[in-house]
Design a protein with these regions (language model features):
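Carbohydrate-associated surface elements
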Residues: 198, 215-218
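Conserved donor-binding/catalytic core segment of Leloir-type glycosyltransferases
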Residues: 230-248, 254, 410
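Nucleotide-sugar-dependent
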Residues: 11-12, 248-251, 305-310, 317-336, ...
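A conserved catalytic-core segment of Leloir-type glycosyltransferases
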Residues: 35-112
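Acidic anion/phosphate-binding donor-loop and adjacent secondary structure
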Residues: 58-60, 219-234
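N-terminal subdomain of nucleotide-sugar transferases
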Residues: 1-65, 191, 212, 416-419, ...
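Membrane-proximal helix-turn-helix segments that form the acceptor-binding/catalytic region
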Residues: 20, 101, 138-141, 145-149, ...
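Nucleotide-activated donor-binding/catalytic signature segment of Leloir-type glycosyltransferases, i.e.
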Residues: 268-277, 282-308
């Protein structure tokens, strides 16, 4: 069996890396994951080389006699209402400092430690290929050095775009400098992979390379065939995961729901909206402002397995997309989890023509709402169906199309590229 060294910090790697690695042996590849943080699950089916490193942000907070577990702005006394404003003085000052100190990212101190471990591995064993996955982008810098030193083919996997990222935190000067680093680093990769066709096209424009591929995120196939839960008796709408203030807009959804309840199109005794994730102050303010405290509840964080159960028992799932035309190529990971639950999805936000809208059409799994009026229209239709049938029907969801997005298929696509690179190297 051929061996692939996967360089990815599992604290940031989302389910993509551990989920894909799990299936590599079925396609003739043994994965060895080099990471700075341990995987969440203890029963991983692949080998892990753990290389702990000092956290640069924590170190700086300690030097400044600050609590390493709390944000800079909170400890500086910046009001909550100002913390998410990108152009506030405190935000710009902190961002400037971060941009200088944490270049190219907060994992910069991992590089030396990881290189030592990777070189030792290559001395002991025959490594046939390398995959690096970002963020953090430090993983690509490590992979580049190992690939060059040991003449090993290398795939650079970008779960988020590097300097083309729609959520890029730093200013024009830092972006200019970092884009030169991106071009210099990735031009030596044998292949570049990202998570959507639109992002692959963006990378092709920047890098002018023809070795760029798209492999979407997905879900563990076991989720698709998990035991189905009884649906809630109420018209339940469920959201799982964090809410990113300034990116996810809950205001239009709550306003639309409030309008329907006030006009008695929806009976408030029938409906419950459940948010499972970190407590969000702005969301709570919106709930109270719309007089929905008896309907909408924040339950806080729950274990991952419990969130899957809550998804499967819900009449309807809420997916918040970003109202930003620059994110048309972004698939929210939550969307794939929702698909595996086989429950209807209500997507709010977005500007249309994006990958999520196409995904909903392809799988017949959900309704896409661009604005408040569309949310009102879709919710009233779904509620009417619930009242007539006692549940929201999911029989039109295309399981075969959904199954195309499982992580076993993603692993197969990675190994096809790996085998091709090995063949080209002779």
């Amino acid at each position: 069996m051929k061996k692939v060294l996967i360089i990815a910090d599992l604290q940031h790697a989302s389910p993509r890396i551990p989920s894909v690695a799990k299936f590599f042996p079925e396609f003739g590849w043994e994965p060895i994951v080099l990471t700075g943080h341990p995987p969440e699950a203890e029963d991983q089916t692949f080998r892990v080389i753990l290389t702990p490193f000092p956290d640069s942000i924590v170190e700086w907070k300690k030097r400044l006699f600050m609590n390493p577990r709390e944000g800079f702005q909170k400890q500086l006394g910046v009001p909550f209402s100002m913390r998410e404003k990108k152009w506030s003085f405190s935000a710009m000052l902190i961002n400037l400092c971060r941009g200088i100190i944490l270049y190219p990212d907060a994992n910069k101190k991992w590089r030396r430690i990881a290189l030592e471990a990777a070189n030792e591995l290559c001395r002991r064993e025959d490594i046939d290929a390398i995959i690096s996955s970002s963020s953090p982008v430090t993983s690509h810098l490590i992979a580049q050095e190992i690939s060059k030193k040991w003449n090993i083919p290398w795939i650079a996997d970008l779960r988020d775009l590097w300097t083309q990222n729609h959520n890029y935190h730093y200013g024009h000067t830092r972006r200019f400098i970092e884009q030169r680093l991106e071009l210099k680093t990735l031009k030596t990769a044998d292949a570049i992979v990202t998570v959507s066709p639109l992002w692959a096209a963006d990378l092709e424009k920047l890098h002018r390379l023809n070795n760029i591929y798209s492999i979407t995120n997905g879900f563990d196939p076991d989720l698709l065939y998990a035991k189905k839960n009884d649906l809630t008796s109420k018209f339940s709408i469920t959201y799982t995961g964090p809410i990113y203030t300034g990116k996810h807009d809950t205001a239009e959804f709550l306003s639309a729901l409030s309008d329907l309840v006030t006009k008695e199109i929806i009976d408030r005794k029938d409906v419950e909206v459940r948010f499972y994730g970190p407590q969000d102050e702005l969301l709570q303010q919106q709930i109270e402002r719309n007089k929905l405290t008896d309907i909408v509840t924040q339950y806080g964080l729950i274990p991952r397995e419990s969130s899957f159960k809550k998804q499967r028992e819900s009449q309807l799932l809420l997916l918040l997309y970003w109202n930003d035309p620059e994110v048309k190529g972004w698939y929210p990971l939550k969307g794939f989890e929702y698909l595996a639950s086989q429950r209807p999805i209500l997507v709010t936000g977005g500007t249309g023509g994006d990958v999520v809208e196409k995904l909903m059409h392809q799988t017949k799994a959900g309704l896409y709402c661009r604005n408040r009026m569309e949310i009102i229209d879709r919710l009233s239709q779904l509620y009417l169906e619930y009242k007539e049938k006692g549940r929201i029907d999911n029989s039109k969801i295309d399981i075969n199309e959904i199954n195309k997005f499982n992580y076993k298929n993603a692993a197969n696509k990675f190994t096809v590229i790996l085998n091709d690179l090995i063949k080209k190297r002779g």
